[in-house]
A protein has these predicted regions:
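Cytoplasmic helix-loop-helix junction between adjacent transmembrane helices
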Residues: 103-145
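Structural signature of the two symmetry-related core transmembrane helices
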Residues: 75-90, 293-309
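Paired small-residue
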Residues: 11, 98-107, 324-333
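Short amphipathic helix-loop junctions that connect adjacent transmembrane helices
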Residues: 25-43, 237-262, 350
Length: 434
């Protein structure tokens, strides 16, 4: 990867760090809001504020995707850090819940502006190389995961040390992201932007999304990716809450005995490392494996993960080999599941090759699918956990993975029609790869 792509990855890490840091610190801030002169915050209010972020990302990603095609991916990716910095400064200044809701909308706008433009830039920069596209997709997902993880881990310590002032420090990190994008990333899309300008009317035409969404490949990819995101998202929303306290309603489930914060944190670190290794491994297999093959492997890996989780959750009283085997199966399944995310991202980038003047609009669908998946996963996870606890989450995960399989066969049959890197030369390779 060249210097600009590495800078994009570095900026993605710092930007996602700031996003994760804000979200986690806000949860602590709201819990202690009366100490800072604000009202007592109910759990439902916290949930509403959490959903507001994803709603903003869902609605605004198409807007900024189209805008990045008109103004340039490099220019629009600069908007995100600015929105984020304003949002965190306002967050530290107020205890008013309405204003805090507005800051979550602004924070969602930050992500909505950044992600489609970043991914549009990556799609353009990797248009000539299967290997480079695989590496870039995996590293983008890795930078996203690492940024979120470090932000979540640092949030309690920073807020304990600085209080609401920590939000202002986060604005500095947003400033670092802006500087990385401004001076570290070269504007590669001047020529493509000029073509786009002559191809469209002078106004920003969101009706372009209608034509793009009529592409069958998008509709085949959408349910698969949304379902995979939902299967992962339900654990993001429920796992810490479920693991952190004993639940007498499910005495037969080992994972409901209640775990300490240290145990949960160490497990999260191990999960993050395994997922990150999986991202790098499968991201380097784009040249030899079809995108849909890697997605299929990922879904199968998710099924193995579920089976391992069941063995762990019901391993009490059974031979020691059963829970140990469950741990190994879950670890292997997670490693394989990780490949589905860069493969789906790479496939979306391939689809963008058919619409070279609409890369930002196409890649904006990444945020749309992610937001829908997170919202759906959160809702399903809540009902599943109430119904059967960890077993309910495992069953919901398995069901969502089955949903992801349904359109995959048809998508696989049409995959060779999707333009990818070195399109004319490589379509045959794509068809014949395993």
């Amino acid at each position: 990867m060249d210097r600009s792509l590495w800078a994009v990855m570095g900026g993605t890490f710092t930007l996602r760090f700031s996003t994760g840091l804000t979200g986690a610190m806000l949860a602590v801030y709201l819990a202690k809001l009366p100490e800072h002169g604000g009202p007592v915050v109910a759990a439902t209010t916290l949930a509403l504020l959490h959903a507001t972020f994803y709603l903003s990302e869902l609605v605004l990603s198409p807007v900024f995707g189209v805008l990045s095609d008109r103004l340039g991916h490099h220019r629009v990716m600069l908007f995100g850090p600015v929105f984020g910095a304003v949002a965190v400064i306002l967050t530290g200044l107020t205890t008013n819940l309405t204003i805090l809701g507005g800051t979550r909308l602004l924070e969602g706008a930050s992500t909505a502006a950044s992600v489609p433009s970043i991914l549009g830039y990556i799609a353009l920069a990797t248009a000539t190389s299967e290997v480079l596209r695989g590496k870039a997709a995996a590293r983008f997902e890795g930078a996203t995961l690492a940024g979120f993880g470090v932000g979540f881990a640092a949030a309690p310590l920073l807020f304990a040390a600085f209080g609401p002032v920590a939000f202002y420090l986060n604005a500095v990190v947003y400033g670092v992201s802006f500087l990385i994008y401004r001076f570290g990333v070269e504007d590669h899309d001047r020529e493509e932007r000029a073509v786009a300008a002559t191809a469209r009317a002078s106004r920003m035409d969101l009706s372009r999304y209608g034509a793009l969404l009529r592409t069958s490949h998008v509709w085949l990819l959408a349910p698969t990716w949304i379902a995979v995101n939902a299967s992962i998202g339900l654990w993001f929303s429920q796992s810490i809450f479920q693991f952190s306290q004993a639940n007498p309603n499910f005495p037969d489930q080992v994972l409901h005995r209640g775990f300490s914060a240290v145990e949960i944190s160490l497990t999260a670190v191990v999960v993050g490392i395994l997922f990150g290794i999986g991202l790098l491994y499968w991201g380097n297999r784009f040249k030899n494996l079809r995108r849909t093959t890697i997605i299929l492997y990922g879904i199968i890996g998710g099924g193995i993960l579920v089976a391992g989780g069941v063995a762990i959750n019901h391993g009490a009283g059974l031979p020691f080999a059963v829970p140990v085997g469950g741990v190994l199966a879950a670890a292997f399944g997670l490693f394989v599941l990780a490949g589905a995310t860069p493969a789906a991202l790479g496939l979306l980038a391939d689809i963008s090759e058919r619409f070279p003047t609409d890369r930002g609009a196409i890649m904006g669908l990444y945020s749309v699918f992610l937001a829908v998946g997170q919202i759906v996963g959160s809702l399903i996870g809540g009902f599943a956990a109430e119904w059967r606890g960890i077993d309910g989450l495992l069953l919901a995960t398995f069901a969502l993975l089955l949903v992801a399989l349904v359109p995959l066969a048809q998508l696989r049959r049409q995959e060779h029609y999707v333009g990818g890197p070195s399109q004319a030369a490589s379509l045959g390779d794509v068809e014949t790869a395993p």
